[in-house]
Amino acid sequence: MMTSKHYEEFMKMAIEEAKTSLKEGNKGFGAVVAKDGRVIASAHDTEVTDQDPIAHAEINAIRKASRNYRKDLTGCLIVSTHEPCLMCAGSIIWSNISEVIYGVSIRDSIKAGRDMINLSCKEIIKRSNAEINIHNGILKKECLKLYNNDIRKLVRKFRTTKKSDWTIIEEDLLNKRMQWFENNKTMICKLKGNDLEKAYHLILMKIGIKSSEAPIVKKSENKIIFHSKNYCPSLETCIILDLDTREVCKEIYERPTEDLIRRLNPKLRFTRNYECIRPYSDYCEEIITLEK
């Protein structure tokens, strides 16, 4: 008997397929077909790389499963990072798949601003009179990251920028942070505390997080050390693209952050403990110092 644990294991495989899709420049969908606890096929969408508008993850997975097993997929289940669209739901029905498991719903995507046909998989299956069980929301939090607009923008940016050109991304980020500082001077002037404390709260303000998400763990007259645990699109992008966050943060994000806090006091400095940074640690250790 299949359990939620099985569904989650299959979903993890589908998520890896979706990550491969994003690395290739496709749209970030993954699917797995399984029977009796055994994976028959796994696939991701190849619309862009194959220039094929119907090469969705579910259809690619069903085609592979049909070749690997048989045309009639009765007794099989399909696990997808995203709710199957109208076309994929039809393919699931025609292939006689018995169970559908997905993470993110069409409704979720529409709310996030994505263009989707607003017709649920459940409604399509209901109209077909097919007996197919549906389970939704499996590893939804993890699947949502695949369709987050901020993460997708960063994935596109890093995919199309050579490492030798990371300075372009750094310079763009620096300019945006300086502009943000100018646009928010009124609020910034209200920051309380000494220059170290103001710098700490300025970083939190820019990222849009609370102190509980990046608590101060050590404080002295000329240094503040805090541990960031907040949701970070850059971190998720690095995980998807297999980039080393230690390199990315050092080469791209450190100088713009330091230059930002130096607007408060030119003697302020910012760095990280690169031996203690996510995903290699549970948190990122970040350090603000005030030179004498």
Locations of regions flagged by a protein language model:
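Helix-adjacent hinge/juxtasegments
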Residues: 59, 63-95, 209-218
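Stable alpha-helical structural segments in soluble proteins, enriched in small hydrophobic residues
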Residues: 14, 18-21, 57, 61-65
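Zinc-dependent deaminase
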Residues: 1-24, 91-153
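A conserved amphipathic terminal alpha-helix motif
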Residues: 249-261
